[in-house]
Amino acid sequence: MVVLISSTVTICNVKPKLEDGNFRVSRLIHRPEVPFFSGLSNEKKKKCAVSVMCLAVKKEQVVQSVESVNGTIFPKKSKNLIMSEGRDEDEDYGKIICPGCGIFMQDNDPDLPGYYQKRKVIANNLEGDEHVENDELAGFEMVDDDADEEEEGEDDEMDDEIKNAIEGSNSESESGFEWESDEWEEKKEVNDVELDGFAPAGVGYGNVTEEKEKKKRVSKTERKKIAREEAKKDNYDDVTVCARCHSLRNYGQVKNQAAENLLPDFDFDRLISTRLIKPMSNSSTTVVVMVVDCVDFDGSFPKRAAKSLFQVLQKAENDPKGSKNLPKLVLVATKVDLLPTQISPARLDRWVRHRAKAGGAPKLSGVYMVSARKDIGVKNLLAYIKELAGPRGNVWVIGAQNAGKSTLINALSKKDGAKVTRLTEAPVPGTTLGILKIGGILSAKAKMYDTPGLLHPYLMSLRLNSEERKMVEIRKEVQPRSYRVKAGQSVHIGGLVRLDLVSASVETIYITIWASHSVSLHLGKTENAEEIFKGHSGLRLQPPIGENRASELGTWEEKEIQVSGNSWDVKSIDISVAGLGWLSLGLKGAATLALWTYQGIDVTLREPLVIDRAPYLERPGFWLPKAITEVLGTHSSKLVDARRRKKQQDSTDFLSDSVA
């Protein structure tokens, strides 16, 4: 329905003046005639009544378009949306949402975001579909269908004999034989005595072994049936995803970088904070699950989101109507399996709560330590979230990029046995693009939302390429490397960080590096540190990879650090470098240090996470991972071979010249 309000030509009542700034003279200009019309349209949709009001100028594009849904007015959305916002009306745009990352999919242009290829249905021959995983048929003995047919023929003959016997017995009974007579009992006893010496074929009979005795006989038909049942279990995950998710799932990287550059940034305040202030219904409970990486807590802690949540809670507390439905915050520290085993759970819990409070987080309803990879704490977390959310709650999972949100949700769905499409997981920042609404994990009508990772530009890992990022990523339990450092010495952590001990009230201090073992180290004199960096950065000091790669990461800046402690054995303070790891200092006295790293990288001083150092000390000089040693060895061998060939060539040329 469209209602035309006015189509008249209006004339401006205001007489605009054009002022000359040089001579301050106001000159009158003619009144322009503006062809103008306005109107209303009413569009019915399945779930809500939508009214659209459009203000436009004739023969021109739309000036402004607003949309009213159930009385709430907001700017009308464009039909060229790229990412899902997790709203019910997202499904009404006629676009397919990628279940892996939340982007609207399209099959027109492969260079645009959300491209996917439609699946081709191919009829497979069932006779050729004989591939079954070995573990699915473990404990079964394979039997051919030909043998089954022979057995079926034998069974038919046996059935005929039994049938004839039964018919004969019936005729005998009709002739006066009594089944319950003593004569029948005597015959049964005689038969039992005759069969006492017989037993079923067992181990040692023919080719029957203990393994074959334990196995169950399975025919080819039954094998196909088992394969189909196993395929049905995974059918819920056999869905179409965008080309980006396909590349991340199968190759661990984004192949189309041109489409990646067209993706807009995620606006947390507009898309999430405003929805937390106004819940979808008065009876629904809002639960915010904040996911933080344990091995990079300060780098992955979403400070901006925590600040927004704190403001939301303050507004809700001041509002008497909304004070009943305050958002509940649950902090989940993931990847606890990567931390050293000597950290007690109680101490880790206190440390996490203290760091969250220092980061600006509001009051926490609960704190959970979880490992989605090793299934630690997932069951208890799921039970607590269900209890908080209730039957109609909304659970928002937020966190920094690559903090493990999608991995956690996949673990929750497996623990609950919910048939939910697997979210895309990859060691690449920004895997999830749009807000994904996930049903089936929580009870009744409660919903869970997976949100895009929040961008933290101060992370060291964001400066690196994919190969360098793999080197700094901690994938196994982090192991310490400790040095005893004197004043005037420096420790290089790859080509990314340098720590100088400028002065100290004691002779030496202990510095322990907690980072990936793929990152090389070096301990030497501070006076030679600059020369070491220029000569070995990108070669022995990796990452970065490449001789001139360090200059592409930015300029170095110095940060002065004052520390003090009362024990060499117990660490006094941690220096956290966002996106890389942390350094622990142990000393008995005071010291002044200088930390060098690239400009813009976040460096945080905090209480120590691990109070112990490594059981042994590293020697001065280079500490090189095996991979770098092999590469350098191959490179050195090539140089030696090249020099030997050049020397042989020079000798040959000299002899040739002498003969001539």
Curated annotation (Swiss-Prot):
GO terms for molecular function: GTP binding; hydrolase activity; mRNA binding; rRNA binding. Mostly expressed in stems, petioles, leaves and flowers and, at low levels, also in roots. The keyword Iron does not apply. Keywords: Brassinosteroid signaling pathway, Chloroplast, GTP-binding, Hydrolase, Nucleotide-binding, Plastid, RNA-binding, rRNA processing, rRNA-binding, Transit peptide. Residues 273-457 form the CP-type G domain. Disruption phenotype: Chlorotic dwarf mutant pale green in bpg2-1 and bpg2-2. Reduced sensitivity in the light to chlorophyll accumulation promoted by brassinazole (Brz), a specific inhibitor of the biosynthesis of brassinosteroids (BRs), via the suppression of Brz-induced chloroplast protein accumulation. Decreased number of stacked grana thylakoids in chloroplast, but more starch grains, and more and larger plastoglobules. Abnormal accumulation of precursors of chloroplast 16S and 23S rRNA. It comes from the Eukaryota. Residues 1-53 form a transit peptide. GO terms for biological process: brassinosteroid mediated signaling pathway; chloroplast organization; chloroplast rRNA processing; developmental process; positive regulation of carotenoid biosynthetic process; positive regulation of chlorophyll biosynthetic process; regulation of DNA-templated transcription; response to absence of light. CDD domains: YqeH (cd01855). Residues 130-158 have a biased composition (Acidic residues). It holds the Pfam family YqeH-like_C. GO terms for cellular component: chloroplast; chloroplast stroma; mitochondrion. Residues 127-158, 191-212 are annotated as: Disordered. Induction: Induced by light, but repressed by dark. Up-regulated by the specific inhibitor of the biosynthesis of brassinosteroids (BRs) brassinazole (Brz). The keyword Nucleus does not apply. It is found in: Plastid, Chloroplast stroma. Binds to chloroplast 16S and 23S ribosomal RNAs. Belongs to the TRAFAC class YlqF/YawG GTPase family. Required for brassinosteroid- (BR) mediated post-transcriptional and translational regulation in the chloroplast, including accumulation of chloroplast rRNA. Involved in chloroplast differentiation. This is GTP-binding protein BRASSINAZOLE INSENSITIVE PALE GREEN 2, chloroplastic.
